[in-house]
């Protein structure tokens, strides 16, 4: 599916004064898909046809990403979880299986923490994590991410362009599955929509939040009251084999697909 088709087949919902792009298609049990950084719900486009044959799939561009509104502010993971809950409530959904990746894993961890506190607006039936920074001590941020998170990030972000995104994406894709030129074009369209490329450094605050809320978010996985699985690409330089090893150390009866 082309990016233009993805957008035209979606919808917008106003949440706390922000326009949030979402898609909901298919029949069957509800599957909520949560995207990564710095992309958007289009992460799931290639598997969308297969998944919607089996599930009622719901996904969205979290504020600050993709086609949703973007602003020069730091986005709290807790706020992203609240936005997702509002979309789920709007759709009349009371329970869902969750599939998440990267940044979305952190949002899913916060949602699981809320569920354990009986404070989530819907019930998570199962949680399937893909590669992500589940533990701040194993997260190997790219050099450019570290720079953008630093005090000079606001200056460096002015130099961000499609070529910089191309270089970063080639560094994190698998050696046998490099991004195509079309992939890079789509990534840049999503990042730069609504001037989002000017605010990417602010979104990186999630790396600080992972340290601040480590105990809460790791505990959410250790005490998860639903089936929990991790599927990991071991070659991921940011959250690959080293993260999986830590996952097996910390998560009881770890269910891992490598």
What is the role of each PLM region?
Residues 15-17, 23-25, 59-103, 113, ...:
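Active-site loop/oxyanion-hole signature of alpha/beta-hydrolase fold enzymes
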Residues 1-31, 52-55, 89, 93-95, ...:
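Alpha/beta-hydrolase fold catalytic core
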Residues 224, 230-232:
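Short beta-strand/loop motif that positions the catalytic acidic residue
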Residues 94-139:
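Conserved hydrolase catalytic core segment
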Residues 241-244, 248-258:
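Catalytic histidine neighborhood in serine/cysteine hydrolases
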Residues 18-67:
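Conserved HGGG/HGGXW glycine-rich cap/lid loop of the alpha/beta-hydrolase fold
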Residues 138-140, 159-223:
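Conserved alpha/beta-hydrolase catalytic His-Asp/Glu region
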Residues 234-239:
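Acidic catalytic loop of the alpha/beta-hydrolase fold
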């Amino acid at each position: 599916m082309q990016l233009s088709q993805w957008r035209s087949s979606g919808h917008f919902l106003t949440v706390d004064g922000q326009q949030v792009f979402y898609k909901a298609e298919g029949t069957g049990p509800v599957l909520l898909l949560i995207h990564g950084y710095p992309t958007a719900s289009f992460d799931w486009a290639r598997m969308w046809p297969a998944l919607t044959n089996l599930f009622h799939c719901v996904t969205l561009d979290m504020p600050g990403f993709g086609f949703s509104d973007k602003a020069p502010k730091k986005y709290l993971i807790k706020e992203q979880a609240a936005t997702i809950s509002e979309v789920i409530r709007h759709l009349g959904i009371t329970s869902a299986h969750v599939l998440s990746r990267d940044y979305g894993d952190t949002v899913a961890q916060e949602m699981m923490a809320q569920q354990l506190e009986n404070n989530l607006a819907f019930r998570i039936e199962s949680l399937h994590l893909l590669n992500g920074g589940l533990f701040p001590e194993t997260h190997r941020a790219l050099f450019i991410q570290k720079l953008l998170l630093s005090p000079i990030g606001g200056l460096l972000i002015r130099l961000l362009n499609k070529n910089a995104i191309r270089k970063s994406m080639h560094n994190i894709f698998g050696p046998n599955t490099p991004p195509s030129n079309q992939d890079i074009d789509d990534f840049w369209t999503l990042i730069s929509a609504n001037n989002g490329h000017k605010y990417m450094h602010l979104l990186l605050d999630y790396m600080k939040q992972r340290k601040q809320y480590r105990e809460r978010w790791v505990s959410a996985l250790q005490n998860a009251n639903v089936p929990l699985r991790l599927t990991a690409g071991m070659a991921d330089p940011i959250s690959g084999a080293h993260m999986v090893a830590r996952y097996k150390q910390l998560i009881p009866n770890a269910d891992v697909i490598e």
